[in-house]
Amino acid sequence: MGLVSSKKPDKEKPIKEKDKGQWSPLKVSAQDKDAPPLPPLVVFNHLTPPPPDEHLDEDKHFVVALYDYTAMNDRDLQMLKGEKLQVLKGTGDWWLARSLVTGREGYVPSNFVARVESLEMERWFFRSQGRKEAERQLLAPINKAGSFLIRESETNKGAFSLSVKDVTTQGELIKHYKIRCLDEGGYYISPRITFPSLQALVQHYSKKGDGLCQRLTLPCVRPAPQNPWAQDEWEIPRQSLRLVRKLGSGQFGEVWMGYYKNNMKVAIKTLKEGTMSPEAFLGEANVMKALQHERLVRLYAVVTKEPIYIVTEYMARGCLLDFLKTDEGSRLSLPRLIDMSAQIAEGMAYIERMNSIHRDLRAANILVSEALCCKIADFGLARIIDSEYTAQEGAKFPIKWTAPEAIHFGVFTIKADVWSFGVLLMEVVTYGRVPYPGMSNPEVIRNLERGYRMPRPDTCPPELYRGVIAECWRSRPEERPTFEFLQSVLEDFYTATERQYELQP
C-alpha cells in the first residue's frame, strides 16, 4: 500500500514462497498458519449442553478459531486454527458451534474464537488492555524492539492507542501514541497522513517508522487465554495427574511440576503426612479457592484421598527470591522491580478487600511467570477473618518477615502483612539478599524492640524507602498504609516524570 493509497490488497493473491514464515500486518492471525502458535489451553468445564437457540442472527455469529483445540470428550468440538464456525448458542465460557468445514457440532471455549472480520482476529489488537498492563506485556523478554499492540484508549472513548517497545542505550522503554479518528472515518497518528483502517495504519508503520520510535515489527506475544476451570472439577481422581519434576518442599509438603490428563501443565502440592491434618489442608485449599484474582496463583482442583494433592497453575520461572538471584533477574532495572512490587501490592489489595490475610508474605512465596508477571502463592496459613487471626501455639513463622505484634502476641492482621511487604520490598531492591544480614532471629527481635529498622540500601531510592518501606514498618499497626494505597504509590512511582503520550511524529 502506498503512502496515501486506499486500494485494498487482493485477497485471492497467493502468498509467495519467500513470504512464508514471515509475519505480515495484512495476514489475519487466525489464518496465519506459519505464526508461532500460542501454547494450547485445555479447558474442563463441561456442563449439560443447552439446546440450540434458533433465533440467533446468523450474520453476526460466524467466528474463526484463533487456536487449535483438542476435544476433551464427545461433547467438545475439535477445531483447527483458522477454521470457520457458526455459533448456535453463545453464552458463558462455552459456546455451542457448528464447523463449516466438517459440519460437526459441539462445544468450544469462547476465548479460542473471534468474530469473522472483527479486530479481535488481528494478533496486534488488545481491545480492553490498559496502559500499565500493555507495558508489562510488551516488556516481556520474548518481545523485541518494535513489538507493538493497539488498544482502546482509556481516556478517549472510540479512539485507540498504539504501544511500541523501544530499546535505547538507556534500556527498554514503552512508547505510547494516540491514534485519532476522523469524522468521516479513518485514522491517523500524524495529521499529515491518514489511513482508512487500523490495518492500513499498521501496514504503513511496519514498512518504515516514519517518525515513530521504531518500525513496527511483530505483534506483542499474547498470553494464553485464561482457563475456565469450574466448580464441577474441584475434586479430581489421582490418576488424572502425573508428577514429573520436583520443584521444592515447604512446611506442609512438596511441590511438583506435572500434567493434568497428560495435557495441561500444572503445579501439584502434596501434603507431608503428620504435618497437619487433612482437614486443615483442605481448609487451606478452600481459602485459596475462594480467593480468585489475576495476581494470585490460581487453584484448580484437589485430590481429597491421602496423600492429598492440591493442583494450581504452573509458573514457569519459579519463586521471585530464586529468580532475583539468576543472571536475568539480577539485571532487572529498578523500574521493572518496582512494577513487580506493584503487582504484588495489587494482589494483596485484593486480599485486603476480601477481609483475608496471607500471614507468610515474602519473596519466596511470590511466583513469576514466563512473561515476568508476579503472583502471590502459599496461602497455607491464610484464613477468612472478621478482624484478626490468632496463631496457634507452637506455629512456625519466619521471624525476619513478621511484624512485632505478631511475634510477641501471635496476633496477625492485614497490617502485619503490610509489615512483611516492607521486608519483601527490601528483598526485591537488593536482588534477594537475606533481611537483617548478619543477625540471628533473637537479635532481630531485640533490635526491633529498641526501634531498629533496616537501613536504606544503596540500590533503593530514598523516596521509595521513606515513602513506602519505612511506612510499612511503623510500630503502631493502624498507622501503616493500606495495600490499596501501596499499590497506587508503586504503580505511579515514575508517572510524574513520564510523558503520557509521545508527540505526533
From Swiss-Prot:
A GO molecular-function annotation: non-membrane spanning protein tyrosine kinase activity
Pfam families: PK_Tyr_Ser-Thr, SH2, SH3_1
Catalysed conversion reaction: L-tyrosyl-[protein] + ATP = O-phospho-L-tyrosyl-[protein] + ADP + H(+)
Enzyme Commission number(s) of this protein: 2.7.10.2
Keywords of the record: ATP-binding, Cell membrane, Diabetes mellitus, Kinase, Lipoprotein, Membrane, Myristate, Nucleotide-binding, Phosphoprotein, SH2 domain, SH3 domain, Transferase, Tyrosine-protein kinase, Ubl conjugation
Binding positions (ATP): 247-255, 269
Source taxonomy: Eukaryota, Metazoa, Chordata, Craniata, Vertebrata
Annotated region described as Disordered, given as residue ranges: 1-37
Coiled-coil region: none
PANTHER family, per database record: TYROSINE-PROTEIN KINASE (PTHR24418)
Protein name as catalogued: Tyrosine-protein kinase Blk
Regulation of its function: Antibody-mediated surface engagement of the B-cell antigen receptor (BCR) which results in the phosphorylation of BLK on tyrosine residues, stimulates the enzymatic activity.
Induction (free text): Expression is under the control of NF-kappa-B as well as the B-cell specific transcription factors PAX5 and EBF1.
Biological processes per GO annotation: B cell receptor signaling pathway; cell differentiation; cell surface receptor protein tyrosine kinase signaling pathway; intracellular signal transduction; peptidyl-tyrosine phosphorylation; positive regulation of insulin secretion
Functional summary from the UniProt entry: Non-receptor tyrosine kinase involved in B-lymphocyte development, differentiation and signaling. B-cell receptor (BCR) signaling requires a tight regulation of several protein tyrosine kinases and phosphatases, and associated coreceptors. Binding of antigen to the B-cell antigen receptor (BCR) triggers signaling that ultimately leads to B-cell activation. Signaling through BLK plays an important role in transmitting signals through surface immunoglobulins and supports the pro-B to pre-B transition, as well as the signaling for growth arrest and apoptosis downstream of B-cell receptor.
Enzyme active site: 360
Cellular location(s): Cell membrane
